[in-house]
C-alpha cells in the first residue's frame, strides 16, 4: 500500500521541477523572450496539464495503481517497451543533473577536488536515499522544499532596493519569442510526468498534481523575475548560473554579506532529493522489465552508470546548457505522445476485454 500523502506528492513534484529548472533553462528563455521570460512558464504549465489529466483519468478506475502498474497489467509487451523508454528518459535527466551538480560544486565551492570524487560522493548519498523508497523521498521533499521555497518567495523583498522595474518593460514584446521561451519552459515542466508514474490516483489526486506544477512554476518565475529585474535581460543571459548570481546580491547586514552560502545550504538537499528521485524511478521502472530483477541490488550499478553517462554525454558546461535546447523535443515524445499512446493501449485493451466477455 502506497503510504505517500497528497501533500508529500505535491512537494515532491514542485521540488522535482524546481531543483535544476532554476539554473540553465532560464538562460535560453531570456535569450528568446528577454524581459518577458519570467512569465512564459505559463505556457509550459498549459502544455503539460492535459497529459497529466489523461494519466489521472486512466488511474481513476484503478485508484490504487500507478501508470507503471496499469501498463504492466494491461499490455505486458507494449507496457515494458514504454516503461523502458521512460526509464531511459529519467536516466538521461539524472545524468544531466549529476553532471551539472558536479560542475557547480567544482566551480563555486571545491575547485581543487577531482570531479570523479565529487561524483562518487553525490551518487553515494543519492543511492542511500533512493534505497529507502518513495515514502522517504517524499518526506525529504516536504522537509527541504518548504524552507527553500520560502527563501525564494521572499527573494524580491530582500532585493527590493536593487530591483529596476524598467528592466521588465516592454511587456509582451513579440509573440514568436514568447512562444519560444514557453517551449524552453516546457523542457522543465514536462519532467512532472514522473508523478503519475510513481503515485496512484488515491495517494496523489489530479488536484494535487496540478498544484505541484503550479507551485514549481511560481517559484521558478519568482527566481527569474528577481534575476531579470536586478540585472536586466541582456546581462542575465550571459551568466552561467543566473539564480546564484542574483542570490549573491543579497546583503542583509555588514556581517552577513555571504547569504548565498546559507541559501546554497538549503538548495543542495533539494537537488540531492531530485537526483535520488530520478534514480528511484529508473530502478523502479527496471523492476517491471523482468520478474527476477531485484531493485535493491540495482541502485548501486544504476547510480554509478548515471555518473558515467553524465561525463560521457556532457563534456563541458556548454553541452549542459545546449541540452535544454533539445530537451523540449524529447519531452514532446515522453510527456505528450507517450501518455496519449498509453491511453490508447489501456482503453483498447479494456474495450476488447469487454467485448470478449459478451
Swiss-Prot record:
The chain crosses the membrane at residues 10-30, 36-56, 81-101, 107-127, 143-163, 179-199, 210-230, 262-282, 297-317, 326-346. The keyword Transmembrane helix applies. It is a multi-pass membrane protein. Pfam families: Spore_permease. One of its GO terms (cellular component) is plasma membrane. One of its GO terms (biological process) is spore germination. The keyword Chaperone does not apply. Belongs to the amino acid-polyamine-organocation (APC) superfamily. Spore germination protein (SGP) (TC 2.A.3.9) family. May be involved in spore germination. This is Putative spore germination protein YfkT. It comes from Bacillus subtilis (strain 168).
Amino acid at each position: 500500500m502506497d503510504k505517500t500523502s497528497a501533500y508529500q506528492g505535491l512537494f515532491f513534484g514542485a521540488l522535482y521541477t524546481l531543483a535544476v529548472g532554476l539554473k540553465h533553462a532560464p538562460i535560453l528563455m531570456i535569450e528568446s523572450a528577454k524581459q518577458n521570460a519570467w512569465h512564459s512558464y505559463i505556457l509550459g504549465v498549459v502544455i503539460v496539464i492535459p497529459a497529466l489529466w489523461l494519466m489521472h483519468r486512466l488511474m481513476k478506475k484503478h485508484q490504487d495503481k500507478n501508470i507503471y502498474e496499469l501498463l504492466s497489467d494491461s499490455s505486458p509487451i507494449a507496457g515494458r517497451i514504454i516503461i523502458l523508454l521512460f526509464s531511459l528518459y529519467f536516466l538521461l535527466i539524472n545524468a544531466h543533473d549529476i553532471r551539472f551538480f558536479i560542475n557547480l560544486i567544482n566551480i563555486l565551492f571545491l575547485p581543487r577536488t577531482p570531479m570523479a570524487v565529487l561524483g562518487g560522493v553525490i551518487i553515494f548519498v543519492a543511492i542511500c536515499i533512493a534505497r529507502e523508497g518513495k515514502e522517504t523521498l517524499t518526506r525529504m521533499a516536504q522537509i527541504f522544499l518548504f524552507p527553500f521555497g520560502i527563501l525564494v518567495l521572499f527573494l524580491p523583498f530582500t532585493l527590493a532596493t536593487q530591483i529596476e522595474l524598467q528592466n521588465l518593460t516592454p511587456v509582451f514584446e513579440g509573440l514568436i519569442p514568447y512562444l519560444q521561451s514557453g517551449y524552453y519552459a516546457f523542457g522543465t515542466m514536462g519532467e512532472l510526468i514522473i508523478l503519475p508514474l510513481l503515485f496512484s490516483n488515491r495517494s496523489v489526486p489530479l488536484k494535487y498534481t496540478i498544484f505541484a506544477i503550479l507551485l514549481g512554476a511560481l517559484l521558478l518565475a519568482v527566481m527569474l523575475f528577481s534575476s531579470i529585474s536586478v540585472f536586466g535581460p541582456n546581462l542575465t543571459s550571459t551568466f552561467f548560473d543566473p539564480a546564484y548570481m542574483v542570490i549573491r546580491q543579497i546583503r542583509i547586514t555588514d556581517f552577513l554579506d555571504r547569504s548565498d552560502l546559507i541559501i546554497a545550504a538549503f538548495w543542495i538537499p533539494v537537488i540531492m532529493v531530485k537526483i535520488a528521485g530520478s534514480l528511484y524511478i529508473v530502478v523502479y521502472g527496471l523492476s517491471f522489465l523482468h520478474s527476477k530483477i531485484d531493485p535493491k541490488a540495482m541502485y548501486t550499478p544504476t547510480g554509478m552508470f548515471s555518473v558515467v553517462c553524465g561525463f560521457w554525454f556532457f563534456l563541458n558546461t556548454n553541452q549542459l546548457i545546449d541540452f535544454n535546447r533539445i530537451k523540449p523535443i524529447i519531452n514532446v515524445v515522453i510527456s505528450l505522445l507517450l501518455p496519449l499512446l498509453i491511453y490508447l493501449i489501456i482503453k483498447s485493451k479494456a474495450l476488447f476485454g469487454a467485448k470478449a466477455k459478451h
